[in-house]
């Protein structure tokens, strides 16, 4: 049998195999496209010496972020967060990075990554913090421990800057901002009314 005849003989079989493979791949893509994918991105520190690699994976209803750090080309470690959205905000001196995300219950959380040691050094739920409010009324000093919803707005030196709005125990609406020292359990450094 000549080469041309052999080619003609197997051509229908090859076509059928290609169609079958294409169909299987098409079905697999249709089934899995909404259940599993990942997006790799990165963020570089202001001084350019530290790179964080962010891998976003979605499987079914679960959205997960994995952040790994590299310094001088060496991969140190990684951390994972289950959330639909994750943001990173570098400190001016590049030594720390705030990792901001929202939990499944809707609480905004800010973790602090120490980029020198590669460790998470502070984790705080924004809805669990309280603010001690001072005012003078008829000669008395009143102190209220007020649960507040804080929004992280950025770094100022070693302090993390937050805006807040809340109502104290006397029903007075409060809003403003303060700087919190990440190394001392978010001690209030400054209280400013808007």
List where the protein language model places each region:
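Acidic/hydrophobic-patterned starts of short beta strands in beta-sheet-rich repeat architectures
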Residues: 51-52, 96-100
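Beta-rich catalytic cores
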Residues: 84
């Amino acid at each position: 049998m000549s080469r041309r005849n052999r080619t003609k003989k197997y051509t229908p079989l090859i076509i059928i195999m290609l169609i079958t493979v294409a169909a299987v791949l098409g079905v697999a893509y249709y089934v899995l496209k909404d259940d599993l994918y990942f997006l790799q991105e990165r963020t570089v520190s202001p001084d350019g010496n530290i790179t964080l690699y962010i891998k976003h994976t979605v499987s079914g209803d679960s959205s997960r972020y994995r952040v790994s750090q590299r310094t001088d080309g060496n991969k140190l470690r990684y951390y994972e967060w289950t959330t639909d959205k994750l943001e990173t905000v570098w400190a001016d001196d590049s030594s720390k990075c705030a990792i901001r995300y929202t939990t499944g219950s809707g609480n905004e959380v800010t973790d602090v990554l120490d980029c020198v040691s590669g460790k998470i050094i502070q984790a705080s739920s924004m809805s669990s913090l309280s603010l001690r409010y001072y005012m003078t009324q008829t000669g008395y000093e009143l102190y209220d421990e007020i649960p507040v919803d804080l929004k992280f707005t950025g770094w100022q030196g070693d302090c993390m800057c937050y805006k807040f709005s809340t109502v104290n125990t006397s029903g007075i609406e409060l809003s403003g901002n303060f700087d919190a020292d990440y190394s001392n359990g978010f001690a209030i450094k400054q209280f400013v009314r808007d």
